Amino acid sequence: EPVNGPLGVQLAVQVVPNPVITQVVLEPEDNKIEPQVIEDTFSSDYGRTLNLNELQLRMKELQRWYSSNGYSLARVSGPTRVSPDGVVQLKVLIGTVAGVEVKFLNKEGEDTNEKEEPIKGKTKPWVVSREISIKPGEPFNRTQLESDIRRLYGTSLFSDVKVTLRPVTGEPGFITIVLGIVEQSTGSLSGGLGYSQSQGVFGQVQLSDSNLFGRAWDLALNITYGQFGGLANLTFTDPWIKGDNHRTSFRTSVFLSREVPQVFQSQNDGDIVSLRDYEDNNSKYAYSIDSKKNPADSRFNNVSKAGNEFPETSWFDYEGDSIALERVGGNIIFSRPLNGGDPFKKVPWQVLAGLNLQAVRPINYAGGTRPYGIPRDKIKNDRIENDEIICTSFDCADRNTLASVRLAATYNTLNDGRNPTSGNFFSFGTEQYVSIGENSPTFNRVRTSYTHFIPVKWLKLAKGCRPKEGEPENCPQALAFQIKA
């Protein structure tokens, strides 16, 4: 302030020290930072006179905390107010999501075609947006968005996802997330040759579309024909029922298969073959109707005639074909993770429930019903011990109906679903078959398995196991232990 003096007017400057810091407050209250972080950052300044230069350094520390926790748009400014009792108020502008837009791009990354019209994607926009956990009105978090992008890639529907953050005009701190989606081909026709223990050498043709009607539905037709049978299977899968917060999936299939059971391939070196007919009259031996080496010293045209004339003797009509099982049926399966209604929460537990219905018929290669089989090497002098005759179906029926309810649960803590090196995988399932009529058996089947992976670094054969200086190591190795029952 000016003061009159003997030499003229003097300017007196009155210096008032900053108050002693007692507390630092961030505004607004919903600032996403934990109180302990604020305490740890400013605790060394409490009880000391406010120094604005040091305050700026502390604000940069807060800025780094926000950035390291994914809030890359957050800005800390101030102080906006310093009270006489030492309360310092800082302002935090985190960055708020105003909305999420989906744009479809071509392979060149353009969102319009030659006619300057927007690219129309096959996928429904809600299939994309439902994988995005950041909602309008929530703070923008880079880490959260990266997880959302990984989920989009996990659908296997998109070859590229480009992210653009567009500021909202007239609304500072608000941004719109623009997702540029490049779709990949989801329809396929494939074929090949292979070998399996159940089918032997086989050929396979598969026709599928994993984005049916743009709703992420998967429809697949698989036809396999092999050395020991064939299979036709039509499967429909909805990986996430629309509108379900539990992320419930649905799968159904219908199938027709004909294959030689593994037990018939391996037992007696695959020597179990078919009988056209068989009549058990509780005798010690069963005799072939095609030979005279029997109590009647005569051949017969059919088993019924032989049984009528010699009712105390068991008879069989030998055919000699391999025995296959024809299965016609379908199933319905629902599964969901135990996420408590949060579709974006990663949880180890998943449960499954399903229904299965199928008709099973033992047949020869011509498709004729063959409920009886015989070990060929046990036939001596055109007869066989009666106890050696095999029922190839339940109760030796021409057809069995199998109806079951299936319940299962899995626990998965693997670090990588495709190439795990650590973690555990446990599964438990039970399938209860119930009788729904004649020749429909009742029984239960229980299966369980446990696998444990231990990471190791024993071999250095792969190039990724011998990285040069500055290169990342890529050397996944593990020991796996598995128990099944």
Name each model-derived stretch.
Residues E1-V201, V205-Q206, A220-W240, L355-Q358, ...:
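Periplasmic polypeptide-binding modules associated with outer-membrane biogenesis and secretion
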Residues E101-E114, S257-D271, L275, P337-G340, ...:
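Short regulatory "switch" loops immediately downstream of catalytic or recognition motifs
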Residues L50-N53, Y318, D416, E438:
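Short acidic, glycine/proline-enriched loop segments that cap or flank alpha-helices
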Residues N31-Q36, Q63, R75, P118-W126, ...:
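Gram-negative/organellar outer-membrane beta-barrel architecture
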Residues G368-A485:
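C-terminal outer-membrane beta-barrel translocator/porin domains of Gram-negative envelope proteins
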Residues E101-V102, F250-V254, G330, S440-H452:
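Conserved long hydrophobic alpha-helices within structured protein cores
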